[in-house]
């Protein structure tokens, strides 16, 4: 019917806007798993620009990308990455606790810090909690309460 045709015409621009919103969200979010997240957005964009892909498959892939981003808010993970500290790249262990905290610890565990919204900032006194969080995230220690620094926006 005519309504089906109208809806089919509206889906591609909606999917493009949703992909744009997702890309903007990732660019403004904490810088975790950026390669993986950017690759996912690029795959969605490739799907949206491929005329052979059905509208239903486009919708499925966009919604799947949104669901993966949503899950980041509910999970704890650790991985190795290279970040810039004091003007030089250093390989560190990253600890992400949902979207609440993104922390790093030097490989020798001599320093730990947090992403403060714009840069990595060393935080004294949190080496052991960050180490414990990394162990929990890597499943080498049982989950437990963890005291970690949290960046609060708009607060004092």
Predicted regions and their residues:
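Charged heptad-repeat coiled-coil "stalk" segments of single-pass membrane proteins
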Residues: 1-59, 63-70
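General N-terminal targeting signals
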Residues: 23, 61, 65, 76-79, ...
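Charged, low-complexity, helix-prone segments enriched in Lys/Glu/Asp/Gln
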Residues: 37, 69-72, 76, 127-138
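Soluble extracytoplasmic domains of inner/organellar membrane proteins
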Residues: 43-100, 107
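Long mid-to-C-terminal scaffolding/interaction modules that assemble large complexes
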Residues: 87-156
């Amino acid at each position: 019917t005519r309504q089906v045709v109208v809806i089919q015409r509206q889906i591609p621009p909606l999917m493009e806007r949703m992909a744009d919103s997702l890309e903007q969200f990732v660019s403004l979010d904490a810088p975790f798993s950026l390669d993986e997240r950017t690759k996912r957005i690029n795959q969605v964009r490739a799907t949206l620009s491929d005329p052979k892909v059905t509208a239903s498959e486009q919708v499925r892939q966009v919604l799947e990308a949104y669901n993966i981003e949503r899950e980041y808010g509910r999970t704890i993970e650790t991985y190795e990455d290279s970040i810039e500290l004091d003007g030089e790249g250093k390989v560190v262990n990253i600890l992400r606790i949902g979207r609440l905290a993104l922390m790093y610890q030097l490989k020798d565990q001599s320093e730990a810090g947090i992403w403060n919204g714009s840069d990595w900032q060393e935080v004294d006194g949190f080496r052991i909690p960050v180490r414990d969080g990394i162990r929990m995230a890597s499943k080498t220690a049982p989950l437990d309460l963890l005291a970690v620094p949290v960046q609060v926006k708009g607060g004092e």
